[in-house]
């Protein structure tokens, strides 16, 4: 399927998932515009989140939740929700997104799959200037790599400086500035936080690339939506990744997917 046709399909499905249940997207949240084209969401005017969001097990003890709900092999509807002062879930943003080329269910390095489970964001970084990120942000440079070096002591699945590890296995590591479109803004998802060699590395939330309607295992959003996430993310944000069919069977059935 051509990229444009696939994007149109994903947009339609994302709208269908949100609109019957609650307002979808940032327009309903009456956001305050910023010079970075992002939004700092005012929860007092934001739309209610879809009912199924608050019914998730992960939502019970969370104040903010980020959901990647797979709807196709490489597509997802991606949304962020936050409790207001009364404990009601409000939708900060919702957008189409891309997941791994081979879908959901990551188990090893290089399988081109996005992991399923409950995670957290551990690090905010990117090639671009700080977009007024709500948590600490690091602007990467030419010396920064994400280590895919499985040798002991080379910090597999961590950001490293090449000057500290001059013999780093760069072939299997990511030179972050080389991904000039995708890594404008990134949040690291703490999949394989223990750094078990071969289990997988460099699983990020990042901006969409220019051509491919999938990722190597990360989650990709339009750049403007990524800015919204960066400007509203909390340190304790809970990240949930699974299929929509698993997260909300009723919604899946209503959409006849």
PLM feature spans:
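Sec-dependent signal peptide cleavage junction
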Residues: 17-38
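Short, solvent-exposed beta-strand edge segments and adjacent coil->beta transition regions
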Residues: 28-32, 63, 216
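Cell wall/extracellular polymer interaction/catalysis modules
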Residues: 38-215, 225-237, 241-257
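Hydrophobic helical h-region of N-terminal Sec-dependent signal peptides
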Residues: 11-17
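N-terminal non-cleavable signal-anchor helices
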Residues: 11, 29, 40-42
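Bacterial N-terminal signal peptides that target proteins for export
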Residues: 1-11
């Amino acid at each position: 399927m051509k990229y444009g046709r696939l994007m149109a399909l994903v947009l339609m499905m994302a709208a269908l998932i949100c609109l019957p249940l609650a307002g979808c997207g940032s327009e309903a949240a009456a956001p305050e515009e910023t010079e970075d084209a992002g939004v700092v969401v005012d929860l007092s005017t934001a739309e209610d989140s879809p009912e199924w969001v608050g019914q998730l097990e992960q939502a019970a003890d969370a104040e903010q939740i980020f959901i990647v709900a797979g709807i196709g092999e490489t597509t997802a509807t991606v949304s962020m929700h936050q409790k207001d002062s009364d404990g009601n879930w409000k939708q900060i943003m919702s957008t189409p997104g891309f997941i791994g080329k081979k879908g959901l269910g990551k188990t090893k390095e290089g399988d081109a799959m996005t992991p399923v489970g409950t995670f957290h964001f551990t690090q905010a970084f990117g090639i671009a200037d700080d977009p007024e990120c709500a948590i600490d942000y690091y602007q990467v440079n030419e010396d920064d790599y994400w280590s895919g070096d499985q040798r002991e002591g080379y910090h597999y699945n961590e950001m490293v400086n090449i000057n500290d590890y001059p013999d780093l296995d760069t072939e299997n590591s990511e030179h972050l500035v080389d991904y000039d479109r995708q890594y404008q803004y990134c949040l690291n998802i703490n999949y394989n936080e223990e750094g078990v060699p071969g289990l997988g590395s460099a699983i990020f939330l990042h901006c969409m690339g220019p051509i491919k309607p999938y990722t190597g295992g990360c989650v990709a959003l339009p750049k403007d939506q990524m800015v919204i996430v960066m400007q509203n993310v909390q340190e304790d944000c809970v990240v949930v990744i699974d299929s929509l069919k698993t997260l909300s069977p009723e919604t899946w059935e209503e959409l006849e997917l």
